[in-house]
A protein has these predicted regions:
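Secreted/periplasmic carbohydrate-active enzymes, especially glycoside hydrolases
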Residues: 1-234, 257
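Conserved radical SAM core fold
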Residues: 182-187, 241-247
Length: 257
């Protein structure tokens, strides 16, 4: 239930931007300039621990991403998820389609816009593909076309593995060099800006970095796309910061020691 609501009457609750402040897990109320509002029901879905705001960065509020409004045909493609599998000289490309895709045609083109594979199922093969490398990317384009809709998505083909000695990309060891970054700029603050994004990646390239950490939240889709284009690895963080003093049993077996 990942939903946020933008309201105009100063009301704050668990679903608004900015969100209402949770004092503790038993608190069923949030506050705004007009008074106290009750929050209905499901208090158990919120953590009982108190959030300690000790950020070492300015935590902007509001909408940080570009907002797009677009129209769709009645029968349309909602989304596609691409997975690549290494299999000898061939690489299998599978696409999971969400939406109406009973008559879908799948086509993969290379960076020269030449067709390298096609089919009417979500599983197609590319022989001797160009691999996506760190610092030297190569992106194919998958086009999914139906009678009423068309969806295009760029993707790279690479194999990621690791052991107790190194991280490997396409079976080659990679030494990570980079930074923990933030999505802001002194002039405009937090809003997404394509020119600033490209400037940041050019600076990363200039200093010979090959990765960055998204401290402390997932970054905009536009930035992740640029990382693909620049051959940059990304350590993608979850949106959690300032959640201190959680006991060990909170994560149980999911913890990585």
């Amino acid at each position: 239930n990942n939903r946020l609501t933008v309201v105009i009457d100063n009301r704050l609750d668990y679903h608004t931007l900015p969100s209402g402040r949770i004092v503790n897990g038993n608190d069923l109320f949030v506050y705004d300039q007009l008074g106290k509002y009750a929050v209905s029901g499901d208090k158990d879905r919120f953590p009982k621990e108190k959030q300690i705001i000790n950020h070492d960065f300015y935590n902007y509020t509001g909408i940080h991403r570009s907002v797009l409004i677009y129209s769709l045909p009645e029968k349309h493609i909602d989304d596609i998820v691409i997975r690549t599998v290494v299999n000898g000289d061939y690489h299998a490309v599978s696409a999971e389609l969400k939406g109406d895709g009973t008559d879908a045609v799948y086509t993969v083109t290379d960076e020269n816009d030449e067709i390298v594979s096609s089919g009417r199922t979500g599983g197609i093969y590319i022989k001797d593909p160009h691999l996506w490398q760190v610092g030297k990317s190569y992106l194919y384009t998958l086009t999914v076309r139906t009678a009423t809709d068309c969806y295009r998505e760029k993707f790279g083909i690479r194999k990621i593995s690791f052991d107790d000695r190194s991280l490997y990309v396409n079976d080659e060891p990679v030494y990570l060099k980079g930074f923990g970054m933030h999505e802001d700029f002194p002039v405009i603050g937090k809003g997404n800006n394509s020119a600033v994004n490209i400037r940041d990646f050019e600076l990363l390239k200039w200093i010979n970095a090959n990765c960055f950490r998204t401290s402390h939240y997932p970054y905009a889709e536009e930035i992740m796309d640029l990382a693909d284009e620049y051959g940059m690895l990304v350590v993608d963080e979850v949106p959690a910061v300032g959640c201190n003093n959680w006991p060990d049993y909170t994560y149980g077996k999911d913890r990585l020691d």
